[in-house]
Amino acid sequence: MSRRCELTAKGPLVGHKVSHSNIKTKRRFLPNLVNVTFISEALERNVRLRVSTNAVKSVDHNGGLDAFLLKASADALSPRALELKRAIQKKVGVTAPVKKAS
């Protein structure tokens, strides 16, 4: 199980632990991941995802899982979240934006 948010792609960061005497040692800053069950109104079922607490706030702010996934870019989403996004688009009837060749 990876330590990466399925909706926002937040992952571990690397930094220093700094002691009182200013000695720096390497450490990892892990994202605050929680297992959350979201309700998809379009799919009419519960969806369990491992997301960061920041993503939970973002989903609530955007008006639910369906609205969040429809607005989210495909780059940040996990493969499982991408499948959900496509299923919601198919159910709702929203077409994905077409990229123009330049």
UniProtKB/Swiss-Prot annotation:
Keywords: Ribonucleoprotein, Ribosomal protein. One of its GO terms (molecular function) is structural constituent of ribosome. This is Large ribosomal subunit protein bL28. HAMAP family: Ribosomal_bL28. GO terms for cellular component: cytosolic large ribosomal subunit. Pfam families: Ribosomal_L28. One of its GO terms (biological process) is translation. NCBIfam families: L28. Coiled coil: none annotated. PANTHER family: 39S RIBOSOMAL PROTEIN L28, MITOCHONDRIAL (PTHR13528), LARGE RIBOSOMAL SUBUNIT PROTEIN BL28M (PTHR13528:SF2). Belongs to the bacterial ribosomal protein bL28 family.
